[in-house]
């Protein structure tokens, strides 16, 4: 059993944690944390191994001894405790939390947990912040290093939220604690508190404007995209395959639905695949996994999906059956077609497997002559939606 004890910036340990640290035969942690704890005779002190994947070897080396690790604040708030549990398992790790930097930041700002959100950029692409931006939101940003405030300021400016107040809360809980506004000095250890202001794109609803996506015309349009996503039904923890992804709009909106969703966009054209990556970053979901290749071959080795969207290439031999077979029980498949050949395929699939078959026809008002307007129909889309039975 590895016990992880939280420690604050000034070296404070929770009472239970202090006793555990004092009795530990082996103490692990970052060099800064180890330096904050008084020496204990006979105690072995080791910094975290690099890479962290070597940790099991360190634990085996000290098997049979009492091992305690130090971590910042609450180890399970975007901390190493989460990494250790994923690596070693829940039964192998015990956690004794201290006050987290998030709790201290909320206290300094006077923000309740209910009216503020936490975004971690530790070891992550700063573009992940974009999804969270909306006028009036209060965001606590866990920074990766001293360069994070500049990256955040650049994103705010580019995304239309240049009026956001950026508070830099440094060395929280220590005698050297600071509270400044950016631009200004940035301590190595800090949390950003953002009071978001501006007029940038700020919707979590499905059906973002088509012009939100860089595209070459291969794009699932706004109205039919919203219909598809309502049937794909994104939920936390669910994985989507977006097959024939085009501009990646369906996968991107799936990811924007919740931070714990995941998605793989499969696109045969390399230029479009690169474009998908740019769209994902600009719309706040850089975690999108883009696979360049032609389905169904490109699907080999992908993790099992909870939902599949086939927006292009449905006529590829065996593709729909491959997607149906890959789905987890209860998984959802949505396929679109605009050609007679694809429509025929989807009608056959409907008759063979059931589900829901819908023809989506949308018209928009456009100028007609010099003085009038009229309805212009978009190309109709046939949509087949199917759910895999739990007992299959």
Give the positions of each predicted feature:
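A contiguous loop/helix-start segment that scaffolds small-molecule binding in enzyme catalytic cores
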Residues: 1-4, 14-16, 64-67, 135-218, ...
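Class I SAM-dependent methyltransferase SAM-binding "motif I" and its flanking Rossmann-like core
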Residues: 8, 72-136, 296, 306, ...
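Conserved class I S-adenosyl-L-methionine
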Residues: 237-246
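Glycine-centered, small-residue-biased loops immediately flanking beta-strands
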Residues: 238, 261, 331
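Conserved SAM-binding loop of SAM-dependent methyltransferases across substrates and taxa
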Residues: 247-259
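S-adenosylmethionine
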Residues: 268-273, 289-367
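Conserved SAM-binding loop
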Residues: 276-277
């Amino acid at each position: 059993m590895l016990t992880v004890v939280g420690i604050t910036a000034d070296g404070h340990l929770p009472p239970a944690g202090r006793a555990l640290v004092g009795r530990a035969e082996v103490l692990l942690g970052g060099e800064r944390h180890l330096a904050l704890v008084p020496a204990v005779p006979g105690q072995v002190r080791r910094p975290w191994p690099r890479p962290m994947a070597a940790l099991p070897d360190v634990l085996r080396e000290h098997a049979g001894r009492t091992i305690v690790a130090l971590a910042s604040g609450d180890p399970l708030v975007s901390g190493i405790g989460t990494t250790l549990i994923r690596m070693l398992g829940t039964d192998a790790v015990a956690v004794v939390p201290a006050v987290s930097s998030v709790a201290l930041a909320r206290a300094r700002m006077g923000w309740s947990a209910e009216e503020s959100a936490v975004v971690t950029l530790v070891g992550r692409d700063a573009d992940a912040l974009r999804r969270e931006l909306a006028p009036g939101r209060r965001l606590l940003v866990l920074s990766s290093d001293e360069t994070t405030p500049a990256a955040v300021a650049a994103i705010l400016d580019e995304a239309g939220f240049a009026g956001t107040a950026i508070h830099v809360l440094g060395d929280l809980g220590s005698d050297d604690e600071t509270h400044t506004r950016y631009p200004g000095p940035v301590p190595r250890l800090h949390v950003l508190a953002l009071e978001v202001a501006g007029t940038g794109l700020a919707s979590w609803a499905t059906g973002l404007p088509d012009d939100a996506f860089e595209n070459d015309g291969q794009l699932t349009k706004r109205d039919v995209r919203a219909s598809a996503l309502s049937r794909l039904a994104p939920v936390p923890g669910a994985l989507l395959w977006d097959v024939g992804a085009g501009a990646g709009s369906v996968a991107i909106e799936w990811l924007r639905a919740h931070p714990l969703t995941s998605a793989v966009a499969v696109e045969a054209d390399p230029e479009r695949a690169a474009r998908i990556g740019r769209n994902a970053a600009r719309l706040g979901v850089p975690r999108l996994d883009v696979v360049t290749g032609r389905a169904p071959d490109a699907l080999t080795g992908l993790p099992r999906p909870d939902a599949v969207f086939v927006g292009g290439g449905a006529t590829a031999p065996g593709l729909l059956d491959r997607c149906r077979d890959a789905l987890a029980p209860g998984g959802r498949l949505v396929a679109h077609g605009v050609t007679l050949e694809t429509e025929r395929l989807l009608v056959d699939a409907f008759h063979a497997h059931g589900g829901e078959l819908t023809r989506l026809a949308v018209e928009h008002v456009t100028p007609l002559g010099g003085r009038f307007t009229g309805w212009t129909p978009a190309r109709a889309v046939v949509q087949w939606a199917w759910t895999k039975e739990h007992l299959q």
